[in-house]
Design a protein with these regions (language model features):
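Long, charge-rich, low-complexity alpha-helical segments
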Residues: 38-211
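Short, amphipathic alpha-helical interface elements at domain boundaries
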Residues: 10-55
């Protein structure tokens, strides 16, 4: 399904990275990114690297590893040494997906992407890529009973209907092998390129910070 990263000429594995957070101020003098209730001011090089992977996973540029590590330590990027489809999944699986409701692009209403967008926009909790894959694997549709505040508990029970999936990391590991994985990841990447999404890392308090 994918190939491991090949070592470059210096023997260092290339990494892929994906930016997290939402740009809230862009100017020649200052670039600010909001993430989980905090605002970070980025210098020119950090801003360029963050913007580079804002709408799609990118390879870490040679010589920029320390910059990317600083972004990752601040929660503004995720990295992986995997390649291809698995790299995309690994980068997305640990993120909470947040809808960009102020986007200038047209709403996504039909087809596969429309269904995924409905979950992201209308579910009573912020979903992860792994949870969306689980819903697709089950063939679960975004019906009114599973949406909004009133559907939060039922939706959670639907996703975690198997008690084994409750343990940390179990769902991510299981969905990595799901036949529904690649289609869902590609849908998320399309929505990301359209400016409909931004990413937030997991963790206590993070969900509220993204709303």
């Amino acid at each position: 399904m994918c190939n491991r990263a090949n070592a470059n000429k210096d023997g260092v594995n290339n990494m892929m990275y994906l930016s997290k957070g939402l740009a809230v101020q862009k100017s020649t003098e200052e670039f600010r990114v909001s993430h989980c209730g905090k605002v970070f001011a980025l210098g020119p090089e950090m801003a360029r690297l963050w913007t580079n992977a804002q709408q799609a996973p990118k390879e870490v540029p040679a010589g920029k590893e320390n910059y990317i590590r600083r972004l990752e330590q601040s929660g503004l990027a995720g990295t992986t040494k995997e390649r291809g489809d698995l790299a995309h999944y690994r980068l997305l699986s640990g993120c909470i997906i947040c809808p960009e409701l102020d986007s200038d692009t047209k709403p996504v209403q039909t087809g596969y992407d429309g269904r995924i967008w409905t979950w992201i926009e209308q579910a009573g909790l912020r979903l992860t890529a792994s949870e969306l894959i689980r819903l697709e694997e089950q063939g679960t549709k975004p019906v009114p009973a599973l949406l909004g505040e009133q559907g939060r508990q039922e939706l959670t029970e639907q996703i975690y209907s198997s008690k084994e999936l409750i343990w940390d990391g179990t769902l991510e590991s299981e969905m990595e092998r799901s036949p529904a994985r690649d289609a869902l990841v590609m849908s998320l990447l399309r929505l990301l390129r359209m400016g409909r999404l931004f990413w937030c890392r997991g963790g206590n308090g993070c969900e509220t910070g993204c709303l």
